[in-house]
Amino acid sequence: MQEWNDIYDEYRNRTGRVHLRGTPWKPGEYGLTVCVWVYDGSGHFLLTRRAKGKSFQGTWENTGGAAQAGETSRQAMARELFEETGIRAEESEFEFLGSDRDKCTFYDFYCLKRRISLKRIVLLPGETDAVMWAGYGKIHWMIRTKKICRIIASQFRRQESELKKRNLSK
């Protein structure tokens, strides 16, 4: 199934045009990707392992993905979280952490407090194949040993102070 994404300009305005996922972006075109750090209130974050056949296969990541055409950032976050983990959350439950931009993507970062047994997580076949809770220490070790996807490792480093400011370890 083809996936279409809204095209944004450099100021993050929707252009009214759409982009077919997997095709190159033109200069000055941007997509929107959302990421969430699900935390349990006890200093642990939910991580999933990327399935075989995906880029960065076998590495761990937080939940996220591209917003589809017509979706808001929060709508995309709720959809991605449900698709990849089976966790349902209202858009209003996501706490906004901040945004970033690279050469063709705007990123929105969120956190979500949710205590849930790993047995209740429903992984999306072909996307992820394992799940765990990991604290700051374990995440730092996983970054050093390259067990976390390098893109996610970079995001975590940029978001860590904001996550700690929000006292997500309690």
Predicted segments — roles?
Residues 1-35, 39-41:
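Acidic, metal-coordinating catalytic segment for phosphate/diphosphate chemistry
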Residues 7, 38, 47, 111-112, ...:
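Conserved hydrophobic "DFG−1" position in protein kinase catalytic cores
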Residues 26-28, 56-61, 132:
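A short, polar/proline- and glycine-enriched secondary-structure boundary/capping micro-motif
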Residues 33-64:
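A glycine-rich, hydrophobic loop/mini-helix early in the fold
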Residues 66-148:
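Unchanged
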Residues 148-170:
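Charged phosphate-binding loop/patch that engages nucleotide di/tri-phosphates or the phosphate backbone
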